[in-house]
């Protein structure tokens, strides 16, 4: 069955209705700006409600491989899993990819799909050719796939890019990074380096000193080769650190005894809010933040939350956690 036929069946509509909707689907977005944490603005493009339904149906029908070292938007993996991969290594190198989602274009998607299909054909039996069958199912309707998955940012623009805001974008972005993740992982194994990628955040760590500073050149080369020159590193967010300095990965602190922590600054602030609660001076907004952050702290560093129960008594902490008598 063609992609149009599969989508139509999944959505319980006719093939004609499906084809008609996908004509110009790349323009069915509402865009707006949100402030970035470090200054500036990020443009979010939100698909229409109906387009989201099509995109989710597409993901239900077609499954794209994700590399083992990709930690973001993958079931069973998280920021905690990402940080824990590096906890035992004293030397750390972090960077990120500039303008990540909007740098992913249809050309990269189809190139990665074709390369993986060719590689699979050489190495597997016909019955196991999942990527090859995926490629064959989609390539005959390339124009409609592009309209479904990519956003056209300007009224007169012919350019198509992946949007921040579409339910299909996380899966497609991870897939488009597969060859890069594969190449970098192999390169890192040769150098005794641990590598993970959380969306656009790249993290490298090792037990061997003086390896990581020279690694950035190899990394930029692989970006050009594996991503068709569409992406580059954000050099302003490139940092080297070691046990002698504060090591943080996706907001989580790596302690010198190889554990994960929310960090001393956050612990002090949480205790401050608990004191405000005890005195009856906490605002509704701060109380909501406290409850939410306690849940996060319990996930990252449960021992800290246990220590709060011991210090402030179960009665006080239960009133916060379960919103008793507030």
Mark where each language-model region is.
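Right-hand nucleic-acid polymerase module
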Residues: 1-34, 41-129, 137-166, 175-188, ...
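Short beta-strand
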Residues: 194-198
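Short beta-strand->loop micro-motif that forms the acidic, two-metal-ion catalytic signature
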Residues: 200-207
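Conserved, non-catalytic sequence blocks in retroelement Pol enzymes and Pol-derived host proteins
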Residues: 169
């Amino acid at each position: 069955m063609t992609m149009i036929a599969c989508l139509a069946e999944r959505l319980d509509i006719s093939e004609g209705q499906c084809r008609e909707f996908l004509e110009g689907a790349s323009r069915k977005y509402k865009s707006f700006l949100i402030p970035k944490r470090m200054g500036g603005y990020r443009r979010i493009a939100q698909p229409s409600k109906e387009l989201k339904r099509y995109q989710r149906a597409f993901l239900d029908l077609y499954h794209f491989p994700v590399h083992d070292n990709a930690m973001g938007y993958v079931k069973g993996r998280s920021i905690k899993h990402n940080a824990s991969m590096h906890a035992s290594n004293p030397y750390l190198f972090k960077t990120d990819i500039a303008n990540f989602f909007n740098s992913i274009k249809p050309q990269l998607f189809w190139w990665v799909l074709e390369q993986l299909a060719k590689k699979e054909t050489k190495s597997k039996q016909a019955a196991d050719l999942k990527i090859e069958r995926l490629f064959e199912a989609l390539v005959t309707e390339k124009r409609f796939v592009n309209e479904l998955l990519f956003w056209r940012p300007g009224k007169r623009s012919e350019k198509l890019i992946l949007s921040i805001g579409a339910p299909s974008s996380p899966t497609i972005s991870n897939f488009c990074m597969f060859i890069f993740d594969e190449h970098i992982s192999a390169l890192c194994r040769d150098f005794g380096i641990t590598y993970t990628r959380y969306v656009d955040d790249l993290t490298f760590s090792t037990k061997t000193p003086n390896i990581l500073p020279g690694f950035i050149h190899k990394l930029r080369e692989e970006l050009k080769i594996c991503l068709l020159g569409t992406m580059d590193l954000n050099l302003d967010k490139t940092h080297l650190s070691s046990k002698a300095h504060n090591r943080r990965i996706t907001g989580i602190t790596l302690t010198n005894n190889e554990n994960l922590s929310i960090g001393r600054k956050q612990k002090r602030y949480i205790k401050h809010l608990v004191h405000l609660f005890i005195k009856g001076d906490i605002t509704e907004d701060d109380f909501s933040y406290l409850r939410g952050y306690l849940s996060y702290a319990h996930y990252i560093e449960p021992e800290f939350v246990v220590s709060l129960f011991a210090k402030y008594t179960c009665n006080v902490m239960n009133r916060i956690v379960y919103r008793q008598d507030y």
